[in-house]
């Protein structure tokens, strides 16, 4: 079994130099203990699940001793926050420890969130709190299990170090993994500070490391933008299809790799409400669920602006026109699968929109609807689901059309269709009230609920007998929890 001290670090981003990041030593937290660890994330580094019991893991994540081979750096970047440019950003509470190469040749950034003050902390203390660390851990691993591209979370470490937010809380750290931590905001930082040579160096670095196919294109920089756009469209299609609301889609929270990244006040839809706002600091609803696609387009235009020293503006505008068609095509295919279709018909989009309108009008639970649609033969499932709708005439019309649509699939094996639907429609979804209950237990020192919740959410499509309580409809109080950016 590989030991933590034997990880193969190769810190290429650190070698870019002090223009791009600053060397910082993690500040230790007091009396650290492991809250939860992900066996799946450990495996990405060729580590066995038993490594979670190694005291050295807590020591490294608590900043109590240096990780052999790591070169902790705070990355420099800026970004647009709620539509306004902020030049004073950067890693204010987290450090890129380094890059590890696993046995498959894959590179994984190790990023320690809550590592203490950095040159970019501004007025902050550089710490993360336990509740936000648990929320990111649970969401990262759950999104991965759902098939949604995301950063990963290896473990959460709690402590007795006090920190002040709205009230006194306890500091924690999160060890995050991602193929890269480069954000849209990295490019904006060098563009708006007019460091164009550094901008070129960053472009060459990310293309060489992550988009090598672009080097064969006539304009590698535009090709890079196209790849980022394509990945972002694919990501947004999955967010919208599975009812995920990020909550704070600032450009500094947008990954060049099209992965879910730096999410704090996130939520999955309970009742279907396209105008849902999960971040109670978002007074204008800029990052509401139904605004995520246009915001992603806006953020891509901000990235494109940062590339204008090297890419023709008209070419970038031409690329941006591809975003919505790419998103719509990917989203439509995902929704077809969720409804059990294997073929495509021209009016499928309209069919799906009619369903969503009916769900909105009746406040139907978004995730449970699709799961229950595959629980029984189609006609029986629709009879049960009819009970959840207010507009019965509208639902009956849609249900009749849906049965006719399924009949045109010419699929004789009903069981195969239902199994296929269960493979894409989760029984278990990370609801805010479940996360809150686990967090409250953890704050009392009981980590078993968060560990059990993580285990259940890591297999969201499986029945998991005995765990049905995690699949229940949320209580009314659980639908209205306010989540803030405070972390």
Curated annotation (Swiss-Prot):
InterPro entries: SelO
Pfam annotation, one family: SelO
Residues bound to Mg(2+): 253, 262
Cofactor(s) listed in the protein's UniProt record: Mg(2+); Mn(2+)
Enzyme Commission number(s): 2.7.7.-, 2.7.7.108
Keywords in alphabetical order: ATP-binding, Magnesium, Manganese, Metal-binding, Nucleotide-binding, Nucleotidyltransferase, Transferase
Source superkingdom: Bacteria
Enzyme's top EC category: transferase
UniProt KW Manganese keyword: yes
GO molecular function, one term: AMPylase activity
Record's catalysed reaction(s): L-seryl-[protein] + ATP = 3-O-(5'-adenylyl)-L-seryl-[protein] + diphosphate; L-threonyl-[protein] + ATP = 3-O-(5'-adenylyl)-L-threonyl-[protein] + diphosphate; L-tyrosyl-[protein] + ATP = O-(5'-adenylyl)-L-tyrosyl-[protein] + diphosphate; L-histidyl-[protein] + UTP = N(tele)-(5'-uridylyl)-L-histidyl-[protein] + diphosphate
Active site: 252
Binding site for ATP: 90, 92-93, 113, 125-126, 176, 183, 262
Keyword Magnesium: yes
Annotated PANTHER family: PROTEIN ADENYLYLTRANSFERASE SELO, MITOCHONDRIAL (PTHR32057:SF14)
Protein family membership: Belongs to the SELO family.
Function: Nucleotidyltransferase involved in the post-translational modification of proteins. It can catalyze the addition of adenosine monophosphate (AMP) or uridine monophosphate (UMP) to a protein, resulting in modifications known as AMPylation and UMPylation.
Protein name: Protein nucleotidyltransferase YdiU
Species: Azotobacter vinelandii (strain DJ / ATCC BAA-1303)
């Amino acid at each position: 079994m590989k030991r933590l001290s034997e990880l193969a670090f190769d810190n290429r981003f650190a070698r870019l130099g002090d223009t791009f990041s600053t060397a910082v030593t993690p500040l230790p937290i007091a009396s650290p203990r492991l809250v939860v660890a992900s066996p799946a994330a450990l495996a990405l580094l060729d580590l066995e699940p038993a490594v979670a019991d190694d005291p050295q893991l807590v020591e490294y994540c608590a900043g109590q001793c240096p990780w052999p081979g790591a070169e902790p750096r705070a990355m420099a970047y800026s970004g647009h926050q709620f539509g306004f440019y902020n030049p004073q950003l950067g890693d204010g509470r987290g450090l890129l420890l380094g890059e590890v190469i696993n046995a498959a040749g894959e590179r994984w950034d190790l990023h320690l969130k809550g590592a203490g003050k950095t040159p970019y902390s501004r007025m902050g203390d550089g710490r993360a709190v336990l509740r936000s660390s648990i929320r990111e851990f649970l969401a990262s691993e759950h999104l991965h299990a759902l098939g949604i591209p995301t950063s990963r979370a290896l473990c959460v470490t709690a402590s007795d170090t006090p920190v002040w937010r709205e009230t006194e809380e306890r500091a924690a750290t999160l060890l995050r993994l991602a193929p890269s931590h480069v954000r849209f905001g990295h490019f904006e930082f060098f563009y708006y500070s007019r460091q164009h040579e550094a901008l070129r160096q960053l472009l060459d670095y990310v293309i060489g490391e992550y988009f090598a196919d672009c080097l064969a294109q006539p304009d590698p920089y535009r090709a890079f933008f196209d790849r980022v756009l394509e990945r972002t469209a694919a990501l947004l299609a999955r967010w919208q299809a599975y009812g995920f609301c990020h909550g704070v889609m600032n450009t500094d929270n947008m990954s060049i790799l099209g992965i879910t990244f730096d999410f704090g006040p996130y939520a999955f839809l309970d009742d279907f409400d396209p105008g849902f706002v999960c971040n109670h600091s978002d007074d204008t609803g800029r990052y509401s669920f139904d605004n995520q696609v246009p915001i992603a387009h806006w953020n891509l235009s901000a990235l494109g602006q940062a590339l204008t020293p090297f890419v023709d503006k008209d070419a970038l505008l031409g690329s941006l026109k591809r975003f919505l068609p790419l998103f719509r095509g990917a989203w439509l295919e995902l929704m077809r699968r969720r409804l059990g279709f294997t073929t495509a018909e021209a009016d499928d989009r309209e069919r799906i929109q009619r369903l969503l309108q009916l769900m909105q009008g009746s406040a139907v639970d978004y995730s449970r609807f699709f799961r229950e649609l595959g629980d029984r033969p189609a006609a029986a499932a629709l009879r049960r689901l009819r009970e959840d709708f207010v507009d019965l005439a509208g639902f009956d019309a849609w249900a009749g059309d849906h049965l006719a649509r399924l009949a045109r699939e010419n699929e004789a094996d009903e069981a195969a269709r239902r199994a296929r639907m269960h493979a894409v429609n989760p029984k278990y979804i990370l609801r805010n009230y479940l996360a809150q209950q686990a967090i409250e237990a953890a704050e009392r020192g009981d980590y078993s609920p968060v560990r059990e919740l993580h285990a259940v959410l890591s297999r969201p499509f499986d029945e998991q007998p005995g765990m049905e309580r995690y699949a229940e409809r949320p209580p009314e109080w659980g639908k209205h929890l306010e989540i803030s950016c405070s972390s």
